[in-house]
């Protein structure tokens, strides 16, 4: 709901950029925070207080944070990737079982590949952005659109409440309810989340992961209907067990 992103999407829909051939999405920044375990603290309480450190709680930062950039890629390209191959690692975290960084190649088919990079390490170069290349130019997610051959793009007027897209999305939500035209983005949210999970699984295991591995029971994939433990049921019945701190997935073995 940010005006600049809407304008970029509109330009792509109008064909100004031509077919998207590739791009890169980044969320490279510093660490968030972590909580040390308290004496006598239950596994459930520790995991909840330290949720940004456990894959079972946040999905790892490729899912919890970098998903925003991955979502832009899916939105602009108009489809989900067919497969992913990635890697990652852990260098500075002290608690939990997450990686510090991920690097994933998403293949969207039709000759389009997106390089995905995310990192949570202090003292490094930071970048949070998206870049796309089409047959007729390039653009950042937030613009500007730079074309090889000029195209006259007549942008519509976009409402931007108080200059904030985070306020505007609530305006759109409430307006949809009032007007009887509710917005349902559940499919887009689910697909972007699954795209990030696909990248995470590839990085954890070191294997090529296909979209159908996660969505098609006939694929006989070990990752179909994957469920992390502990889950909601374990927290509700009091049996939640925290994974060991600083024990992480090893590619080639996970």
Residue positions per predicted region:
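Predominantly a Rossmann-like dinucleotide-binding segment in NAD(P)-dependent oxidoreductases
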Residues: 1-95, 104, 122-124, 128-131, ...
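C-terminal helical cap and adjacent loop that interface with cofactors, partners, or active-site loops
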Residues: 57, 64, 68-81, 85, ...
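Glycine-centered tight beta-turn/hairpin loop motif at sheet-sheet or coil-to-beta transitions
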Residues: 109-113, 136-137
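Flexible, glycine/threonine-enriched loop-and-boundary segments that flank and lead into catalytic domains
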Residues: 113-121
